[in-house]
Amino acid sequence: MNVAFLDERLLRSLSATLLDVFDELRVYRPDPATLVFVAATKPLDIERQMAATGLPLRRTPLHYARFGINTVEDLVAALVLDDSGVRELASGASLITDNNNRMATSSVYELGRGMSPDATGRILAPYDPLQRPDSFVYRELGGALAFDYIARRLAAFAPLDASLADRIKRIGAALGDSAQGDYVRALGVSVAGRN
């Protein structure tokens, strides 16, 4: 979904509605203007599974490459809301129903009140697993991921979304005193200087 069709309130309500129907929800942002909602009735351990087994990427690499997913790092870079983050974002939001379908009746897009890429990044930042040092990304996958690659991938989109400089800096901070942390922090400073 293009972020221009949503404001923060609609994003929260859409997330709450999906969580009302499905047990699990993750939100990916493959590019600054797009949100992809992945919902399921069973646990979604996509990143963990891919890091451990290479699946499903290993079975059909060309299929996923069309969407820019060539490594587990590509998927982690796109992940902006894991299950705990999306639950926090959606907490207290009103549901979208047939009788109150704000997705169908909203004039957010028509009035130019939709989110920009930068606004989207800033709204999602507190819930983003890459910006939370206590998230599963660092606890469970940290040793298996090339965070320098993730940061470079994000930097490629920084001209379209200024919030990515802050995201990169927070990744560097989460990595602490390490070679990857030093590299990512330096890249974050460089990206911030270009915007």
Question: For each of these PLM feature ranges, what is it?
Answer:
Residues M1-A4:
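ADP-ribose/adenylate-binding Rossmann-like module
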Residues D7-R29:
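Conserved Class I S-adenosyl-L-methionine
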Residues R26-G188:
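Soluble small-group transferase modules, centered on the S-adenosyl donor enzyme superfamily
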Residues V189-N195:
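Alpha-helical linker/edge segments of TPR/alpha-solenoid repeat scaffolds
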